[in-house]
């Protein structure tokens, strides 16, 4: 059983593999927590293969949250309690601890599946005579409220807020705010129903 499967199983496996994964998570926590401007609750499970680096910002990961192998957390990022970030997902926030425009803010009990990308800035490209690489970025914060499920291979564009209790279907590209308790899908993502069961279209 892999580290990710062990996390998905609720960390309940009373075997040698379970012990090995718990030890691995402890090592991952210790490595990440000693980095500058990184605060991780001691109850978190962090794979040693995860990449956690605050760069010029700060990272906070709340009680009981998990970060799976090969997930990336960089820059200004806050993750609440009981949330999970699965393998190969990328969270990149911008700014500094004092200037949090461009931060990524994840609430409590949020599920982020594999290969999700959330970036707190977009490249500027207004001037066609100037290389895009030299035009800088436009920082805009991303907020994921509590109890949200983001399925695999989702892209969330800078400046978006995803409302509490929402579901983002696999492969969606979210370009605008998502209302609370809605289900969105598609490219660009649109509301296909509310969790109450009421279809919108």
Regions found by a protein language model. Give the residues of each.
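Beta-rich strand-turn-strand
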Residues: 153-165, 172-176
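Conserved G/P- and acidic residue-centered "switch" motifs that form tight phosphate/ATP-binding loops
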Residues: 168, 186
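Short alpha-helix at the nucleotide-sugar/activated-sugar donor binding site of glycosyltransferases
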Residues: 111, 166-167
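Catalytic-loop signature of eukaryotic-like protein kinases
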Residues: 147, 165, 182
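Extended, small-residue-rich solenoid/repeat segments and analogous flexible loops
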Residues: 1-58
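Flexible, glycine/small-residue-enriched loop-and-beta-strand segment within the central core
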Residues: 50-61, 66-158, 187, 195-198
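Glycine-centered loop/turn positions within well-structured domains
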Residues: 176, 180-182, 190
